[in-house]
């Protein structure tokens, strides 16, 4: 017995290799669908969305968590690319900038057709898998991107948006964000306002996944109660393990379980360990916890790569997903549970959202009350009591008569 002590490290290495080999085999059949990647923001920040810039070559892009070789090494088969614009665009140029971020995602697919396939459905994801491409979908990160307009919501859907985060780190006029729970923002909607409920219903009608990352706990509960389809948290972790208000508390995880919804675990150190440093094992702890509380069907990956300043040791970039999967296998996750976390759980939710959609239903039309909007940079067409030039003949004159009478001496 004592003579074989020198074999122990070799046995440990072989066991580790065994789990990673199994992870690779699984991921060759079931590549990961990640819920949130901010590469489009980096393309704006570094290159002003100019993909022809030599430095923006996605095959050799440096200083980012994401490039094509890293995606291939990580067995990434599906990616929700974030069409993110900051909160300071709210009530200003949020819609314009969101359109530009959707455009750069679409141009990524056009520039690298051998790697990316822009798709808009669960069927499209499966087809991209078969072709060995990265199924590329648009997630709009923040309800401020629709400028409180159901019409803009519908337009973004037609441009390919398949999930929308109800808020970023700021309230919209119709939904409260996570900073309400820290006391840094004041609650405006107590979760969702009447118009916020209309947004959720219209997303259900269209077949857009409702994303509750970044929202307040009251907004989480309101949306989970109201939605007629499962929802997602595209990049959030477990509050019980790291009490950061961007994470999901256990009582909400119970609602996730009851509604067949999904939490895609974030890799940002501050949400994993509540400190500047974290490691791969701690990310696996979050996956374990969500599995324990909400069930294996409620777990996914939402790394938040290229949207955060620090990531865990062992998960330095998108190439490292197989190492995390190997850790789950070491923790005795079954192959079916691993395949669920990689892709099958997201596909199930997406298919349920598609099935719950009803394009034959009349679209939502009731606008948000003008008084709920910041009005300094907007017109009031449609809200105005001023006479319309498009009234029936005679109506304009009739509406002016009281004004003329008031002007008489």
From Swiss-Prot:
Positions of the propeptide segment: 385-409
Predominant location category: membrane
Pfam families: Peptidase_M19
Catalytic activity, as annotated: an L-aminoacyl-L-amino acid + H2O = 2 an L-alpha-amino acid; leukotriene D4 + H2O = leukotriene E4 + glycine; L-cystine-bis-glycine + 2 H2O = L-cystine + 2 glycine; a beta-lactam + H2O = a substituted beta-amino acid
Cofactor: Zn(2+)
Localization, UniProt: Apical cell membrane; Cell projection, Microvillus membrane; Cell membrane
MF term (GO), any: beta-lactamase activity
Enzyme class: hydrolase
Protein name in the entry: Dipeptidase 1
Natural source organism: Sus scrofa
Gene label: DPEP1
């Amino acid at each position: 017995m004592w003579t074989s002590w020198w074999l122990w490290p070799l046995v440990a290495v072989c066991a580790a290799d065994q789990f990673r080999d199994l992870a690779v085999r699984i991921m060759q059949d079931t590549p990961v669908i990640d819920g949130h990647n901010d590469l489009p923001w980096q393309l704006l920040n570094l290159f002003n969305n100019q993909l022809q810039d030599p430095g923006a070559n996605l095959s050799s892009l440096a200083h980012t968590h994401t490039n094509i070789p890293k995606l291939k090494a990580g067995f990434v088969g599906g990616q929700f690319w974030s069409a993110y614009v900051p909160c300071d665009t709210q009530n200003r140029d949020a819609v314009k900038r969101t359109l530009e971020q959707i455009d750069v995602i679409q141009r990524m697919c056009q520039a690298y057709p051998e790697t990316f396939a822009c798709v808009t459905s669960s069927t499209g994801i499966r087809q991209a898998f078969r072709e060995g491409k990265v199924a590329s979908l648009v997630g709009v990160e923040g309800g401020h991107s629709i400028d409180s307009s159901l019409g803009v919501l519908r337009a973004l859907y037609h441009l390919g948006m398949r999930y929308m985060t109800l808020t970023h780190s700021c309230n919209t006029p119709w939904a409260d964000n996570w900073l309400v729970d820290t006391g840094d923002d004041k609650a405006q909607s107590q979760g969702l306002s009447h118009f916020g409920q209309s947004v959720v219903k219209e997303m259900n009608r269209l077949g857009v996944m409702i994303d509750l990352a970044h929202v307040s706990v009251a907004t989480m509960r309101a949306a989970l109660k109201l939605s007629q389809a499962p929802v997602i948290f595209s990049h959030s972790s477990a509050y019980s393990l790291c009490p950061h208000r961007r994470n999901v508390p256990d009582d909400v995880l119970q609602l996730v379980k009851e509604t067949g919804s999904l939490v895609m675990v974030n890799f940002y150190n501050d949400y994993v360990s509540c400190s500047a440093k974290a490691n791969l094992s701690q990310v696996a702890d979050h996956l374990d916890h969500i599995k324990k509380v909400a069930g294996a069907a409620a777990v996914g990956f939402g790394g938040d790569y290229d949207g955060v300043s620090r990531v865990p040791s062992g998960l330095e970039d998108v190439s490292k997903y197989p190492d995390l999967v190997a850790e789950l296998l070491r923790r005795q996750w079954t192959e079916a549970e691993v395949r669920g976390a990689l892709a099958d759980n997201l596909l199930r939710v997406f298919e349920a959202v598609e099935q719950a959609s009803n394009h034959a239903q009349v679209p939502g039309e009731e606008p948000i009350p003008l008084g709920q909007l910041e009005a300094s940079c907007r017109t009031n067409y449609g809200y105005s009591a001023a006479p319309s030039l498009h009234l029936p003949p005679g109506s304009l004159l009739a509406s002016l008569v009281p004004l003329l009478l008031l002007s008489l001496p």
